[in-house]
Design a protein with these regions (language model features):
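Conserved alpha-helix/loop element of class I SAM-dependent methyltransferases that forms part
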Residues: 72-93
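A short SAM/SAH-binding and catalytic strip from SAM-dependent methyltransferases
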Residues: 161-173
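A short acidic, Gly/Pro-enriched loop at the edge of an enzyme's catalytic core
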Residues: 150-162
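Substrate-binding/catalytic lobe of Class I Rossmann-like enzymes that use SAM or dcSAM, i.e.
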Residues: 205-207, 212-302
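N-terminal auxiliary segments of SAM/dcSAM-dependent transferases
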Residues: 2-50
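A short glycine-rich, Lys/Arg-flanked "PGG" loop and its adjoining helix->strand segment in the class I
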Residues: 175-190
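Class I SAM-dependent methyltransferase SAM/SAH-binding core
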Residues: 98, 104-151
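Acidic carboxylate diad motif detector
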Residues: 193-195
Length: 333
């Protein structure tokens, strides 16, 4: 019995070392949109992320103040809390929604099934589209397609709502991302975004230990840059397409428990080891340092979880919106 325990401990330590080596030697640095697509294709195809995180590849909402909650349930709760915060719950059935960075469609299906919305989900990953389509019953009014959030294929003023969860860190051009999100909204339409952000380094520059931590958080999951909450709100306002003010809030405390819960899933669900084998175990352990760094960064104030809400102004988009040129002719004229 003792020998078996020692063998199991040695095997776990060996796989942990291998996972750490892979983490250090083979980061997933952002190179282009293709590198993001390839990363999500790989994560989708091996099934490990879906097994542990469910249909929602985003953090959970644990309440205010946060309380203990089932990890998968917290993700469902996040969607409903975001609907309420964005003031979408009273919109009529048939409201058209664009889910930007839809993953494998978890949020899209809730929005369609439980709120009666007509949802289009887009992702840069072909394999995520395939899996989202497999998971979506025919009676659920949600469809999915490959698209680029920096150059959306939809005409101006196409949707009543644009919704996005944790897609922004993958965008190298935050100003263009902001413009595209608002461009495809109808006048009076609502934009609701949830994202990982960093502290506004214009106010408090990153210190000597924060810079390497931030570099690891960017390089391990194909992130070119994190915006600050203040900075992305300014990018949205600078498009000239927002009616009134951009509303923001900070959900760091509400989402913080999700990082350690992500690791805990591997402990409380050991059947994953049987299902995915030694290779799956090594892949899972490879992600643990990033989860721990994320918990450290969000807990210490280096990173923040930002929420954004904006209403689309009744103006036309021009090619020079980013430079401040707006056609004030009403869209419907």
């Amino acid at each position: 019995m003792i020998n078996l325990l020692l063998l199991a401990t040695a095997l776990l330590l060996a796989t942990l070392v291998i996972g750490l080596v892979l983490y250090l030697l083979f980061p997933r640095k952002y190179q282009s949109g293709d590198s993001v697509a390839n990363s999500y294709d790989d994560w989708t195809n091996d099934g490990i992320l879906e097994f542990y995180w469910g249909e929602h590849i985003h953090l959970g909402h644990y309440g205010s103040p946060p309380r203990r909650k089932d990890f998968l349930q917290s993700k469902h709760d996040f969607v409903h809390e975001m609907v309420r915060w964005g003031q979408l719950e009273h919109l009529p059935a048939g409201t058209t929604v664009l889910d930007v960075g839809c993953g494998i469609g978890g949020s899209s299906r809730i929005l369609a099934r439980e709120y009666g919305f007509d949802v289009t989900g887009i992702t840069i990953s072909p394999q995520q589209v395939r899996r989202a389509q497999e998971l979506t019953p025919p009676e659920v009014n949600a469809k999915f397609q490959v698209d680029d959030a920096l150059a959306l294929s939809f005409p101006d003023a196409s949707f009543d709502v644009v919704w996005s969860i944790e897609a922004g860190p993958h965008m190298p051009d935050k100003a263009q991302f902001a413009k595209e999100l608002l461009r495809v909204l109808k006048p009076g339409g609502i934009l609701v975004v949830a994202d990982w952000n960093q502290r506004d380094d214009r106010q408090i520059p990153l210190n000597v230990w924060e810079r390497p931590v931030m570099r690891q958080l960017l390089d391990q999951w194909s992130h070119p840059a994190f915006a600050s909450i203040e900075g992305f709100a300014e990018e949205l306002a600078a498009t000239g397409l927002v009616e009134g003010e951009v509303i923001t809030t900070d959900w760091t405390q509400e989402t913080l428990p999700a990082w350690l819960d992500s690791i805990w899933q591997g402990v409380v669900r050991p059947e994953g080891i049987i299902r995915f084998g030694l290779v799956g175990l090594i892949k899972s352990l490879r992600e643990v340092p990033t989860f721990l760094l994320m918990r450290l960064a969000f807990g210490a104030g280096l990173c923040r979880f930002g929420m954004f809400r904006a209403v689309r102004a009744d103006v036309r988009v021009t090619e020079t919106v980013g430079a401040g040129s707006i056609d004030r002719t009403p869209v419907n004229s």
